[in-house]
Amino acid sequence: MGQTGKKSEKGPVCWRKRVKSEYMRLRQLKRFRRADEVKTMFSSNRQKILERTETLNQEWKQRRIQPVHIMTSVSSLRGTRECSVTSDLDFPAQVIPLKTLNAVASVPIMYSWSPLQQNFMVEDETVLHNIPYMGDEVLDQDGTFIEELIKNYDGKVHGDRECGFINDEIFVELVNALGQYNDDDDDDDGDDPDEREEKQKDLEDNRDDKETCPPRKFPADKIFEAISSMFPDKGTAEELKEKYKELTEQQLPGALPPECTPNIDGPNAKSVQREQSLHSFHTLFCRRCFKYDCFLHPFHATPNTYKRKNTETALDNKPCGPQCYQHLEGAKEFAAALTAERIKTPPKRPGGRRRGRLPNNSSRPSTPTISVLESKDTDSDREAGTETGGENNDKEEEEKKDETSSSSEANSRCQTPIKMKPNIEPPENVEWSGAEASMFRVLIGTYYDNFCAIARLIGTKTCRQVYEFRVKESSIIAPVPTEDVDTPPRKKKRKHRLWAAHCRKIQLKKDGSSNHVYNYQPCDHPRQPCDSSCPCVIAQNFCEKFCQCSSECQNRFPGCRCKAQCNTKQCPCYLAVRECDPDLCLTCGAADHWDSKNVSCKNCSIQRGSKKHLLLAPSDVAGWGIFIKDPVQKNEFISEYCGEIISQDEADRRGKVYDKYMCSFLFNLNNDFVVDATRKGNKIRFANHSVNPNCYAKVMMVNGDHRIGIFAKRAIQTGEELFFDYRYSQADALKYVGIEREMEIP
């Protein structure tokens, strides 16, 4: 028993040594290969340069070149000094005029930065990428600063570990190299040095054969366990095993992944269901900023099932032409039956959205079929969280039983098809391609029974053919809930009075500081009211248009009904420190004249980007400053303060470095995030601090995002430098800003 325990203890240690030894060998081999590649490339480039030089020399020999006359004297030029250049060789002396350059004041120091026009969210840096150079004076005053800085990153510094770098190529080579060892080699430490050298030579002789031939069997688990122990940041042993499988699987050229849907515009387009066609769209598209893979919202809101009224989807009762489907017998009755079925169907809230993923061993049918599994909503967006547990699964099963229709996007399948009145004329036998069928299923969830509009969008089918295809697919397309079911009541004046009072109550709870404002995340609690457990209510935020709650939610912000400029506290939006929403505020002009600068609403400047022209020049106070080109009026929007959006913890780590540089561009956005314009930002970052500023900053809610706006505190003339209050403490103000600009005497 004693020997067995000793051997089991020595096994992992031995494998760790092997991992380190093979890793160092592979790294050294990679460096040698890289050096050989550099030498080969250098020789090749050198040869090309020599060949090109020889070609140019031959061309110059054939050309006639006019000789240059050497100036021997400049005495004829008055007020100039001469400078002669002589040589010990047989070259004549050269005399040229000497011109003196006057001293020029140097420009202020500026660190490199990347220009941005909107905020950019970044992840926290848990590893110190480089140790900043502070100068000898800073280190002499505070010798422990570097040590404390490294402690803030838990001692993780980029490049300080000998075995810190491993990419996919080295990982595969390392696993293959470790696979040469036998399972009986765990007690190599007890062997003689001569025997160990012989084994090492045998391994080196077999490495060439190993590289040419693929491994016969999958590597043992102990190999991945040893690699995981040496590189814990690369994942567990199971994760490394899956990664090795993915990297070593041989893929055929041009083969698509098992979960990939062919391009709808390509020759291999297939007829697939709506959720499969829109899976990438729902996964990558951000519904808050209307971009793919946006860099501002890590959480993508799920599509709101409460549909707005849209004139594009309104059904036109007039036929589009003599061949319109409405001339067919039974067409109008069929459309009326669809509308009646939609009105009968109440809107159901989905039980929760998760990122849909198809199993590897299954594929969706090319033709629609009725299936209980397909009624599950798979075209999900990025999830806010993952629910686990038996209780949650029971709830999901109960919700699945209740759900017969998914949402307004018609992602589910209905088992009660609508019967069509038989037509006198037989339907046309038209073949639909996979792309056309998939496009029809995508559009039917938006345009419903507006077959003329769907035909115009498809482009290759008439509205009659679209209508007949819709009748054919009636058994698998669910009736969509009508948009009139959730229409709010018409008593808007009383509702807005209550909301104005509600806004004042919320505003009284906040003192205007960004430290008491929390970041907004859309709430998503199906069939649950927005009570004390709602995340929006907990954070004292209003429910926005991105939330999944009902439009009758008591915490939902309704917008304003102003007919003025929305620049006083009489406007609910202005009172709540938020810009007017063009989707909610329909009477103040926020939704009108989007391309025009003459907008009646003055509370939508940040979202429109109505910034002023700013000029960058040396400041009269310190370093660089920003100046206004055109005059602005009091309370007029000047620019948005843009930069990287980082967490409060990351801001604390960066701030300690910025304090030593005595230069900081950190700006509190809310209680969760900070805007840092040090590395990325716009020109307003150069606005200096003043206790008597001509601008002020205000954090506003703009379409669900907190953004920082810089406004004029008074009327500013052309060419004035912009200042705003950094809200320094008295000690910090004396420490960082020792110069105050001179006040102009009127």
From Swiss-Prot:
SMART domains: CXC (SM01114), SANT (SM00717), SET (SM00317). Residues 329-522 are annotated as: Interaction with CDYL. Residues 196-217, 374-385 have a biased composition (Basic and acidic residues). Present in actively dividing cells. Widely expressed in early embryos. In later embryogenesis, expression restricted to central and peripheral nervous system, liver and thymus. In adult, highest expression in spleen, testis and placenta. Lower levels in intestine, muscle and ovary and very low levels in brain and liver. No expression in heart, thyroid gland, lung and kidney. GO terms for biological process: B cell differentiation; cardiac muscle hypertrophy in response to stress; cellular response to hydrogen peroxide; cellular response to trichostatin A; cerebellar cortex development; DNA methylation-dependent constitutive heterochromatin formation; epidermal cell differentiation; facultative heterochromatin formation. There is a cross-link at K634 (Glycyl lysine isopeptide (Lys-Gly) (interchain with G-Cter in SUMO2)). It catalyses: L-lysyl(27)-[histone H3] + 3 S-adenosyl-L-methionine = N(6),N(6),N(6)-trimethyl-L-lysyl(27)-[histone H3] + 3 S-adenosyl-L-homocysteine + 3 H(+). This is Histone-lysine N-methyltransferase EZH2. It comes from Mus musculus (Mouse). The lineage of its organism: Eukaryota, Metazoa, Chordata, Craniata, Vertebrata.
